[in-house]
Regions:
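Noncatalytic scaffold domains of N-terminal-nucleophile
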Residues: 21-56, 60, 68-236, 240-242, ...
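Internal mixed beta-strand/loop scaffold within catalytic domains of large alpha/beta enzymes
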Residues: 63-75, 106, 391-404
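Internal maturation/activation junctions in enzymes
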Residues: 264, 316-404
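Acidic, low-complexity N-terminal propeptides/linkers enriched in Ser/Thr/Asp/Gly that mediate export
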Residues: 282-283, 291-293, 299, 397-404
Length: 404
């Protein structure tokens, strides 16, 4: 039954974001659930990415004798070219790596971090409430010091088999020679155009030639990104944080500081001091399986474990063809989300009760409430060992998401 739960949960995660309401045309992009299948699985390795070009690059690396990490680096670099709106080099991420020989599960945290000049109230209104999403994300204070390149470099140094430069070649060729932009990329450029890009002549020159997104039927080239990738291939990941590329990044941030005097800017120490964090995986036993995922500050892993644990308390899951199954799944996700939004934060700000939130007694009480409560939005629970909520319960507001 657990395999069925995982399958149903995966189907739901891939489809519900597009169905969520209300939706603005300027929201962060959602999934394309109607897209036809573009790949099949065979052999002893599977590659799954958001773009077939990235998947093909990863498969080619594996066929050339590369490790899974080599394939990962190649795929992520290609995504930076073909999906810059979602997977650019200036972002961040988490990585789980299983070393079968050592029987060791490793979690690396390469998420963005706030610069040293940040203050706790940078993105708050005078009332103490968070700024609206659109206003907050338009401010330079919302830009975090990127971790993607450091994450890829660190894991490649540990588990890579092919030369670092070799893994970046497919991305360099695509950026230099061009590719036909996907509907997702063109749609994201259109959203940015509606929101406003007057502050970035570079964006307009690259993504809005003649005032319009790149045509879908002609190759789109990004020579500047090709040069960036070539520098990374030649000088390695650290050059992004301490070399020529770091100087370019700091110059760009200084330009933002000139346009917005209240922005305190970045210093060389912000980039030079960036470090990937190694964390312990978050694991939970469910039936005969031990399920492991990424711990906080990621909140999605805990939510998935809670959702599965809640569903495991029900006997009403008869299969994907039954609407009741989907209703229960949606409710379980909503209840897990209530805990996620309240309890999960940056571990630097204090302990997070991940164990109590997965405690069997607590899960059982939440499952009973889930099945007996009306369909109103659930509130966060109080897990065992805690006498009171540490801060006020959140207002019911719609969460702004990002690319699935």
């Amino acid at each position: 039954m657990l395999r069925a739960l995982l399958l149903i949960l995966g189907l739901c995660i891939s489809s519900t974001s597009a169905a969520a309401a209300p939706v603005s045309r300027d929201d962060p992009e959602s999934a394309d659930p109607g897209q036809a299948a573009i790949s099949t699985a065979a052999g002893d390795a599977v590659v799954v990415t958001a773009n077939p070009r990235a998947s093909r690059a990863a498969v080619a690396v594996l066929k050339a004798g590369g490790s899974a990490v080599d394939a990962l680096v190649s795929a992520q670099a290609v995504l930076a070219v073909v999906e810059p709106q979602s997977s650019g080099l200036a972002g961040g991420g988490f990585l789980m790596h299983w070393d079968a020989r050592q029987q060791q599960l490793q979690v690396l945290d390469g998420r963005e971090v706030a610069p040293l000049s940040s203050r706790p109230d940078d993105l708050l209104q005078p009332s103490g409430e968070p700024l609206p999403w659109r206003e907050a994300t338009s401010r330079p204070e919302a830009i975090g010091v990127p971790g993607t390149v450091a994450l890829l470099w660190d894991v490649h140094q540990q588990h890579g088999r092919l030369p670092w430069a070799t893994t970046l070649q497919p991305a360099i060729r695509l950026a230099r020679d061009g590719f036909r932009p996907s509907p997702r990329l063109r749609r994201s450029i259109g959203i940015a155009q509606r929101i406003g890009v007057d502050h970035s002549p570079a964006f307009q020159a690259l993504y809005l030639p003649g005032g319009q997104p790149p045509p879908a039927n002609r190759p789109f080239r990004n020579p500047a990104l090709a040069r960036t990738l070539e520098l990374l291939a030649k000088d390695g990941g650290p050059s992004f944080y301490k070399g020529e590329l770091a100087q370019q990044i700091l110059a760009g941030m200084a330009a933002l500081q000139t346009d917005q005097p209240d922005f305190r800017g970045w210093s060389p120490a912000d980039l030079a001091g960036y470090a990937v964090v190694q964390r312990s995986p978050l694991c939970h036993r469910l039936r005969s399986y031990r399920l492991c995922t990424v711990p906080p500050p990621s909140s999605g892993g805990l939510a998935v474990l809670q959702t599965l644990a809640l569903l495991n308390q029900s006997n009403a899951l008869s299969g994907p063809a039954d609407p009741q199954t989907w209703r229960l799944l949606a409710r379980a996700q909503a209840w897990a989300d209530a805990d996620r939004l309240y309890w999960v934060h940056d571990p630097m700000d204090g302990a997070i009760p991940t164990g109590p939130l997965l405690d069997p007694v607590y899960i059982q009480s939440r499952a009973i409430a889930l099945q007996t409560s009306p369909a109103a939005r659930p509130t966060p629970g109080l897990p065992p060992g805690l006498a009171a909520y540490p801060h006020a319960l959140p207002a019911q507001r719609r969460e702004q998401g990002t690319t699935p």
